[in-house]
């Protein structure tokens, strides 16, 4: 069994085991996807579920996978590589291949899940910050009886067009008070990769926070200038 590190990972794994739907939100390297896969593998080993389903939005391909060469697995394999890596580390390459041949482990692009009901399954939606609101709702309503779902993502790494709201951000707002769901948040201090990764993430977080302050100050200054201009024009008009 994979052992969690740190309080946030311990709580996250506990929530996965005690909730049917759990969200793991935070930067890369915090173990949110790895622990979800570990929980799925353990549930399969204990015969608590019949299959593991891995999915993520293929934003880079616009989910137009029909234009890519190969069968379905080959088309979306590059987008699911982090999940494969976790599975291979836990079960070994050959066993994963055999389980996939029997559809015990299934991979599917998010766009292909519409219309399905997933019973007796452990479903992991990775990179969920790149889902649209409609895709997130569709995914959450696919979950059937005796199934668990873990949704992982990083709201600082959204690849959607600026005009498109992230389904993960929307879910965080809409579902935060649903007690049957768990929301688990990770920070740069929770990163369990090379120590320099945590420092890199922290540096970016600090820069982004300062950049947001700068943008707000610039916007406030522009508003003040516009208001001053309007007042000056009004005073000029009154003088005439």
Predicted regions and their residues:
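Conserved helicase motor core of SF1/SF2 NTP-dependent helicases
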Residues: 3-125, 129-240
């Amino acid at each position: 069994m994979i052992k969690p590190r740190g309080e946030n990972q311990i709580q996250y794994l506990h929530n996965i085991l005690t909730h049917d739907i759990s969200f793991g939100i935070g930067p890369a390297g915090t173990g949110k996807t790895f622990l979800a896969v570990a929980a799925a593998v353990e549930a399969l080993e204990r015969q608590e579920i019949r299959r593991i389903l891995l999915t993520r939005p293929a934003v880079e391909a616009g989910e137009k996978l029909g234009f890519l060469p190969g069968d379905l697995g080959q088309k979306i394999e590059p987008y699911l590589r982090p999940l494969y890596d976790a599975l291979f580390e836990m079960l070994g390459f050959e066993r994963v291949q055999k389980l996939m041949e029997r559809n015990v482990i299934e991979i599917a692009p998010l766009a292909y899940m519409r219309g399905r009901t997933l019973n007796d399954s452990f479903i992991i939606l990775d990179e969920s910050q790149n889902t649209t609101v409609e895709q997130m709702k569709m995914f959450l309503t696919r979950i059937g009886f005796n199934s668990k779902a873990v949704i992982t993502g990083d709201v600082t790494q959204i690849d959607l067009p600026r005009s498109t709201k992230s389904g993960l951000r929307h879910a965080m707002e809409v579902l935060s008070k649903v007690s049957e769901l768990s929301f688990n948040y990770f920070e740069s201090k929770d990163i369990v990769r090379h120590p320099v990764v945590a420092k890199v993430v922290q540096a970016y977080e600090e820069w982004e926070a300062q950049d947001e302050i700068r943008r707000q100050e610039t916007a406030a200054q522009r508003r003040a200038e516009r208001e001053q201009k309007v007042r000056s024009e009004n005073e000029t008009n009154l003088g005439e």
